[in-house]
């Protein structure tokens, strides 16, 4: 069984119209994509469902109904780079214009994870004796698809 190491993973943003359903399409897409550089953290990809539980007077039991999916968000941090015209710039632009982007994650085993995202937060953090950090919150806006072939 092969495991995927997170160190070395690359994160790219492209227009939602860019084809990314095969490894070849993903490789072509990231060749001209905006890469998020100096990424320190990335949150969890996935979602949860609302659960409704019904109980009955006539039985000591209950049933559960699974609601629709609510996708999560990923708080990301990277070293601030004012000259970064790629990743940090596109995160700021997507935040400002409220636009959706397609994120292509190149995993270290050569596979890809693809999902649509929006940006709900964009900020910088200044701490004593630390690098300036650029922070964004990436909102997952579609199911994540694993591209393995």
Regions found by a protein language model. Name each.
Residues 1-77, 120-132:
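Solvent-exposed edge beta-strands and adjacent loop segments
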Residues 1-4, 86-97:
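Short linear motifs in intrinsically disordered
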Residues 105-148:
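Short beta-strand and beta-hairpin "edge-sheet" elements
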Residues 87-89, 146-149:
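Short, charged, solvent-exposed linker or helix-capping segments at domain edges/interfaces
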């Amino acid at each position: 069984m092969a495991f995927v190491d997170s160190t070395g993973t690359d994160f790219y943003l492209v227009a939602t119209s860019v084809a990314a359903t095969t490894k070849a399409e993903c490789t072509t897409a990231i060749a001209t994509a905006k890469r998020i550089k100096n990424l320190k953290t990335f949150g969890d990809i996935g979602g949860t469902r609302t659960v409704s539980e019904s109980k009955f007077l006539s039985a000591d039991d209950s049933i559960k109904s699974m609601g629709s999916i609510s996708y999560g968000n990923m708080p990301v941090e990277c070293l601030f780079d004012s000259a970064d015209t790629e990743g940090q710039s596109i995160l700021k632009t997507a935040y400002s214009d409220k636009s959706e982007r397609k994120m292509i994650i190149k995993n270290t085993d050569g596979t890809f994870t693809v999902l649509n995202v929006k940006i709900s937060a964009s900020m910088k953090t200044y701490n004593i004796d630390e690098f300036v950090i650029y922070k964004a919150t990436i909102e997952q806006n579609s199911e994540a698809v694993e591209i393995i072939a």
